[in-house]
């Protein structure tokens, strides 16, 4: 039997409502139960994943695919990501309760029971597979199912609590969306989607590690060995810079291996340099921080805030969004290279 969070069961009605509505800027949602189920899917992560899917479809088609194909791929991908994220919430509900960043997730507060979450995830997974098989193709369905298994089994169950490299290899699941977008159009794979797969794989550490620096104490209290928990800030920031350099170089490979034009190539170079400058700035701040603290430990949360890691976190989102836009636009304004 599921025991609901006492903040919900023992609090007055208005307190319970405010807790349920905290995710909506303090206002209670009109349909709190539906809002709780949506929260399980981590919609912001779903949005970020789908930002890469549709541009890849446009690039693969060399223009605009059918609206129906875009819609069914979008919905199928969103349902698959929602399934994986819900299962992640199910298996991580014990550590989510220990972290301030995640303590208001529905399985922690008792808004949704573990059994209800499992049923919900199963329905999402079945619906995703059915949509891909019926309206897209079997290869895309297999890749979507593979992404779910990689995220839930590979990342959540095997890696997250065991290694500081958890998000590096766990990030493979997030890379699958570009393969799904490509196969939805081509029903086959080529070098181009694997280049973009590599970009997102190398983008994942510079995206998640700054967030982990900001919430280092949360992860430490929950016993999750994120790299910022077990390593000094300079070690983390150095790794972020190295991954960013590799990511920028990988993004440029879409020109010779994927036939991308000048628009994409110029955007990839400019955006890459801009983001690299941000990560180098983070490393410099981390180095100063280590000198100030004498390198004794990673410091307190207030000290870590001086490194300003969230600027790089938000910068990574901007980078991926604009790079994806360049992927989408390139087929429509294809300008060939003079060599």
Curated annotation (Swiss-Prot):
It is found in: Cell membrane. Gene3D superfamilies: UbiA prenyltransferase (1.10.357.140). Keywords: Cell membrane, Heme biosynthesis, Membrane, Transferase, Transmembrane, Transmembrane helix. InterPro entries: Protohaem_IX_farnesylTrfase, UbiA_prenyltransferase, UbiA_prenylTrfase_CS, UbiA_sf. Coiled coil: none annotated. Its main location: membrane. GO terms for molecular function: protoheme IX farnesyltransferase activity. GO terms for biological process: heme O biosynthetic process. Pathway: Porphyrin-containing compound metabolism; heme O biosynthesis; heme O from protoheme: step 1/1. Residues 1-27 are annotated as: Disordered. It is a multi-pass membrane protein. The chain crosses the membrane at residues 45-65, 67-87, 117-136, 140-159, 165-185, 191-211, 236-256, 257-277, 309-329. CDD domains: PT_UbiA_Cox10 (cd13957). One of its GO terms (cellular component) is plasma membrane. It catalyses: heme b + (2E,6E)-farnesyl diphosphate + H2O = Fe(II)-heme o + diphosphate. Its EC number is 2.5.1.141. Carbon 2 of the heme B porphyrin ring is defined according to the Fischer nomenclature. Converts heme B (protoheme IX) to heme O by substitution of the vinyl group on carbon 2 of heme B porphyrin ring with a hydroxyethyl farnesyl side group. Belongs to the UbiA prenyltransferase family. Protoheme IX farnesyltransferase subfamily. PANTHER family: 4-HYDROXYBENZOATE SOLANESYLTRANSFERASE, PROTOHEME IX FARNESYLTRANSFERASE, MITOCHONDRIAL. This is Protoheme IX farnesyltransferase. It comes from Kineococcus radiotolerans (strain ATCC BAA-149 / DSM 14245 / SRS30216). The gene is ctaB.
